[in-house]
Structures are given as structure tokens and as C-alpha cells.
Amino acid sequence: MFEIEAILLGGQDKLEDWIKQEGAPHKALLQIGEKKMIDYILESLRNTPQIKRIVLTGDREIYKDYIEKVDLFIDDTHNFVDNLIKISEKAELPYSVFVPIDVPLITSEIYEKTFSYCEEFCPDCYLYVLVNNKKDVEEKFPGTKRTYWRLKGGYYKMGNIFLIRKELYPKAIEYGKILFESRKSATKLASLFPLWFIFKAALHIATLRDCEKVVVDKIKLNGRAVPIPYPEIAVDVDKKDDLDFVRKILT
């Protein structure tokens, strides 16, 4: 069984108007029934057998009531790469799963089954990119609007959590710096991908294996795109409609 530490990403670049209108100082503290959104996430992580440690990153003042509820708190630097460096320096277990602060639908059962499936799917991988099929998501959650990539064989969405082995941190930091430096230039971003992939993606004939190859060629370590039959992993709370949607399910 994988031994995993959960990295709960609690940063927030700005407080959006719809969150202010809910009377919350942060997305994590949005009320869903009798609990805050972060409570659902922490409860699920705590009850997942493979997760042995929970690390929370964010603003200390926002999370003052939660610092004692996690194993380690890391102050947010407001820079993705710098945060990743700090997290890597504190990593203890063989695997880390990165979890955003806005995925309250993922239950401990889903986490457990997902990690077990990843272990069976590729026991020696360094990176597991979870992928949801549009058909699965819309069958279970009709009406929810997600962004999908059109690939050969269907429409797919990258899941909101991803799993890595501890040894991948240096490569993740290196590649994260490249992405950060290129983020405002379409030309620079395009240069990160081989021409064959750009061509296939434009024609919607790229496959999941093609996507894997691009990533593996960059990190020089084994990684897989893992098709997951759990639509909850695809649903995050990015807008008021999403909040209303998860409230209907959880309350």
C-alpha cells in the first residue's frame, strides 16, 4: 500500500466577489451545510488509509483554527515554485498527493480506491495524472460545466488532484520554473511542446499516450495518465454555480 502525504493547497491569489458575497474571507471557509468546505476535505483525507500525513499551505491568519488539525502548516509564499520548494524540503513519505482547497465532493472511499488503482496501474511510476472522461462526469453530474480537452476517442479533463513520488520534486520544481517564466507568452508556451504534438492536438487526434510521452520526455521519469471512473475528482468550486451545485449534493 502506498504511504502518502496529502499536500492541501490553501493559497488564494485574490478574494473573488462571489466569495465576498457569501461572507467568507477565503474560498476554503465557504459554508456548505453545517461545515466549512475545508472541513469536508480534511475529514476525507484523515479517513483515507494510505494518507499518513497532512500538510496545509496557506495564510496563517486565515487558517488559524486549522493549524492544529494538520500535521504541518507551511506559510504561503504567493509563488507556485517557491511553495513547491518549501513543500519538497518538508516531504517525508514516499508519495505526495496535491489537493486543492475546493474539492469537497471527493470522499475517503474515492481517495482510497484511486490510490489503490494507481498502484495497480503503474507500481513504478513517479507521476500519476488522473484523467476524467466527459461522459462519466456528465452521467453522474448532469448540468455541471467543466472544461475538457478533445482527444482521439473522446473528451477528457485532467483531475483536480495528482500524485507523485518524492523523487519527482526536483524535476517538478525545474519544470515549474520554466512554465512560470513562459506563462505570459503563447510563443514560449508553445515552444515547450514538440511540433508533432501541437499538430496532433490541433487536429484532435492526440491520444492520452501522446500526452504521456510529452510529459515523460520532459521529466525523464516514468509517468502515466490514469483514467479514473470517479467524476468527483473532476468537480471543483470555481464559481457561485459550482458552490450551489455541491451544496445540493452535500446538504
Predicted regions and their residues:
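Conserved N-terminal catalytic core of the sugar/cofactor nucleotidyltransferase
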Residues: 3-4, 8, 35-95, 108, ...
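Conserved core of the sugar-phosphate nucleotidyltransferase
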Residues: 108-217, 228-232
